[in-house]
């Protein structure tokens, strides 16, 4: 069984038993995924030619941002290439501090594709909060918006 098939079998088992916690807990077996990248092996494969909505953000003022699976896959590929050019490598810890906006989801998916470890951070964090997270998380890279770069001045 391929890694993708093992992942899907585990996912399907949990979905099948989602209302029976005891059975799900007792019988679930973690798939043996020696070489598996969810973003590349599952998401991108599912996204190929898939124009169904993958991301739909509705702002408080009613504005909407929509991306299909195919669009999100392609856009996250571009972000992954940019992150790679910035020096992000497999295993690097990357703190992502963006609001609920399209770039957040593009960047998260891109980081997964590169094998980076994502440390999500709310935009409500203070500079002191960020010092703690960056130090304890051994963060090597930060992605944030221009509005929040000043919060990193102490680092």
Short names for language-model regions:
Residues 51-109, 126-131, 135:
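Conserved AMP-binding/adenylate-forming core of the ANL superfamily
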Residues 1-67, 71-84:
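N-lobe entry segment of adenylate-forming
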């Amino acid at each position: 069984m391929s890694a993708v098939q093992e992942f899907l079998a585990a996912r399907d088992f949990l979905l099948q038993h989602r209302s029976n916690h005891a059975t799900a807990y007792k019988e679930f077996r973690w798939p043996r995924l020696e070489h598996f990248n969810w973003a590349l092996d599952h998401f991108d494969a599912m996204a190929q030619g898939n124009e169904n909505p993958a991301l739909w953000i509705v702002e408080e003022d009613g504005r909407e941002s929509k991306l299909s699976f195919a669009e999100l896959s392609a856009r996250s590929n571009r972000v992954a290439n940019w992150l790679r050019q910035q020096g992000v490598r497999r295993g690097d810890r990357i703190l992502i501090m963006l609001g609920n906006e399209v770039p957040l989801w593009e960047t998260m998916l891109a980081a997964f594709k590169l094998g980076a470890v994502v440390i999500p951070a709310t935009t409500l964090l203070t500079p002191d909060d960020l010092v703690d997270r960056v130090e304890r998380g051994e963060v090597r890279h930060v992605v944030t918006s221009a509005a929040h770069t000043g919060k990193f001045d102490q680092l």
